[in-house]
Amino acid sequence: MNKFFKFNEYVEFGKVFKECEAYLIALEHFDNALELSYLPINKNRIVEVYDLRGNTKIFLSRYGDAIIDYNKAIEIDPHNPYLFFWRGFAFEVMQEYQQATKDLSISLKLDPDFTLAKSLLDHIANK
């Protein structure tokens, strides 16, 4: 099978398994997709997989690993407020409030209407 089709298959099946809360199987599919990221694949698609994998790791309470995925995604797309939000969320859960505040502030700067980021930032400020 064509490797580009295989990449898309891994991503789409990963999404399905994540939606079904089969997080370990979803992770396996996202890992397989990222193994093919050496191909000339659209960068937005690579960011999507890092985001999906990072979010799946958050559901599994693997916050440090999720941060690594969000670091990679942000390196590719530093203008995506959701990436900064989720990395900030992971930092907040790990009680790394300074890093969380920094990421959530960046998220709000990129999207001033991102109310969830504002709420989490307020929550940290009230601790």
Segment roles from a protein language model:
Residues 1-127:
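Alpha-helical tetratricopeptide repeat
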